[in-house]
Amino acid sequence: MSTVESSKPKIINGSCGYVLEDVPHLSDYLPGLPTYPNPLQDNPAYSVVKQYFVDADDSVPQKIVVHKDGPRGIHFRRAGPRQKVYFESDEVHACIVTCGGLCPGLNTVIREIVSSLSYMYGVKRILGIDGGYRGFYAKNTVSLDSKVVNDIHKRGGTILGTSRGGHDTTKIVDSIQDRGINQVYIIGGDGTQRGASVIFEEIRRRGLKVAVIGIPKTIDNDIPVIDKSFGFDTAVEEAQRAINAAHVEAESIENGIGVVKLMGRYSGFIAMYATLASRDVDCCLIPESPFYLEGEGGLFEYIEKRLKESGHMVLVIAEGAGQDLMSKSMESMTLKDASGNKLLKDVGLWLSQSIKDHFNQKKMVMNLKYIDPTYMIRAVPSNASDNVYCTLLAQSAVHGAMAGYTGYISGLVNGRQTYIPFYRITEKQNHVVITDRMWARLLSSTNQPSFLGPKDVFDNKEKPMSALLDDGNCNGVVDVPPVTKEITK
């Protein structure tokens, strides 16, 4: 089988500064593939839908707030069913794998991929890969059909199991080839999608008719470009329960302080949105916003002020915040888990003890309650809005695979389903921009100090806006980065 060069970004330029960052297609390296009428044409459920099929030239802009004299900017291919497909129903042998940490909605995505393949396209052969990437070469599989997945969306976790690491490209693609699999659906975070990108490149190199599709998953909402990650709404909703409990504890005792640690290794979206939704939080600390404890304008001074004013206080901190302030023994900062993520110290316990020590030194009465709901938040079933979102992601992923697209993720951009090339979501992480309006809204809600000096403000103004926020699409057109092919095993 002849080898092919590594794929390059497919960039299509149009008038008025229009740029389409297209996704790969099987016909790019397998010319002459036959096409077939889309089975949805004969599906009674869609016979009443006018213009159900997506036009080949439809695209979705990355930014919707533009200047009248500015360029139209970057666009992505619109997701949805096409009139012609590149797989016959009996030809399809699909597989689904979940990797990385748990997230609300995993089972919903699995269910809807199976349902879409089965009910929309008449696919009969669908495999579940058990235990993450390792399952490909550990021969762990389970047959999936509509009966198996019927009610799994009501459960948390993933019925396929998951793991971190275990990525061996050659073994994985060998397994795909040996089993005759021609559609691979990979659900996972940025590390998982980097692995999916490498799998796609190897499949392309071998010249296999195999579509590789990613569905991005991260409870921290730190994947760029897309509006938000599935499971995020559920995580924020569940986080409020912990905040409410901390508030009840704090206001029920003299000088009560409730400290809640939420997920957010590098990005503080859960902490920020849970704080805004709760309205009971007096201080929110996230990785993007530096803070200090001692001295004028420090955290301790603010805590004392709040206790004097109201007699209680609720503090929310993301797990990645304050790592630079913790003990001088920073060995854990150099350790990583199997996915390559840094192992962080427990900032919640450290901050709680620091607050206790401060008040003991000043001989002030204080009662602190610490709540860590981390695994409660991510292990629950998805809520209604996330269930709908997961359905859209899964259906869009299946439509794209049947249409012959490959090497992409299914994601929401400005409220529209799109196909985004792998490199755009693995190049960097999404962060809260603390000079953005949403962070200003949080500060006005909690009345906490910004803890920012002039240098911090200047540095953060240089960062691009975050995608989830209302100002997040105002940044200009960015240069197209090279395809990333490295992966941490």
Curated annotation (Swiss-Prot):
Its cofactor is Mg(2+). It catalyses: beta-D-fructose 6-phosphate + ATP = beta-D-fructose 1,6-bisphosphate + ADP + H(+). Mostly expressed in roots and flowers. The active site is at residue 220. Mg(2+) binds at residue 190. Pfam families: PFK (PF00365). Keywords: Allosteric enzyme, ATP-binding, Cytoplasm, Glycolysis, Kinase, Magnesium, Metal-binding, Nucleotide-binding, Transferase. This is ATP-dependent 6-phosphofructokinase 3. The lineage of its organism: Eukaryota, Viridiplantae, Streptophyta, Embryophyta, Tracheophyta.
